[in-house]
Amino acid sequence: MKTKRVTIKDIAELAGVSKATASLVLNGRGKELRVAQETRERVLAIAREQHYQPSIHARSLRDNRSHTIGLVVPEITNYGFAVFSHELETLCREAGVQLLISCTDENPGQESVVVNNMIARQVDGLIVASCMHSDADYQKLSEQLPVVLFDRSPSDSALPLVMTDSVTPTAELISRIAPQHADEFWFLGGQPRLSPSRDRLAGFTQGLAQAGITLRPEWVINGNYHPSSGYEMFAALCARLGRPPKALFTAACGLLEGVLRYMSQHHLLDSNIHLASFDDHYLYDSLSLRIDTVQQDNRQLAWHCYDLLSQLIDGQAPEPLQRYLPATLQIRHP
């Protein structure tokens, strides 16, 4: 049986007041416009009893906003993006804003489709971890809709941006480990066209240099950020060497997931490999295999994205427009 939605008119009739009076009370303006306290309390009590919910559409028409924002990420199963999405959704919920999430699977064509779908749903703004080669489409879009980029940045973009400084903490981590492995230290990365891949390789190279070690080109192996790519790259490396590598840095926890799966399947978890990675995971504390990591602050990333976008939606000029956040090291080796 179809249920009937409770309306302001229904509340007004039950409370014995006009629809206009009920509307004022339910919209929080009753006291301001001198509706009697007894009347306000009666209207609100009936609204609670009837489980009245205000119409989002009416609210949107009233203030010309949808009170929704869109989040576009490459994949929601990625641990970092999943934690970021959770933190952002919490901020939105507390502010009375609905968060819509879409995934691109690192496909620029699919990214265009999901962004257009968000626009069609009249979101008030977008937060995007883009896989596009340039920001040209977002530059044009930003003229009519607030857009904040996060996690990665097309080259020389002037758009609002929030991301972790990958270079500095990666260099610090590698400079600590490298002196013990001067003859061999491997890097497994994602797509080189993405700024996080370039930044983390730059930090890796810088960390080696700080330890007095020159990067050998053959130490760098790139694929994509899916766990299957980490598995395949590590399998090929072990086959090439005839043994596990002595030291390895993965540019994301997804890649490390693939490495650990291969190691588990081939009984290598007790080997002497020194593992390090960008991105931390709480499960690493439970492993007998020690893993040193660079830990991003997803709560701060989400807060700064929401802060930037909220100010842009309100027509303000936030400062700074581009924000690079620090990361911390999680050292598990003695």
Swiss-Prot record:
Pfam families: LacI, Peripla_BP_4. Residues 8-27 bind DNA. Transmembrane segments: none annotated. One of its GO terms (biological process) is response to fructose. SUPFAM superfamilies: lambda repressor-like DNA-binding domains, Periplasmic binding protein-like I. Residues 6-63 form the HTH lacI-type domain. Keywords: DNA-binding, Repressor, Transcription, Transcription regulation. GO terms for molecular function: DNA-binding transcription factor activity; transcription cis-regulatory region binding. Repressor for the scr operon. Binds D-fructose as an inducer. This is Sucrose operon repressor. It comes from Klebsiella pneumoniae. The gene is scrR.
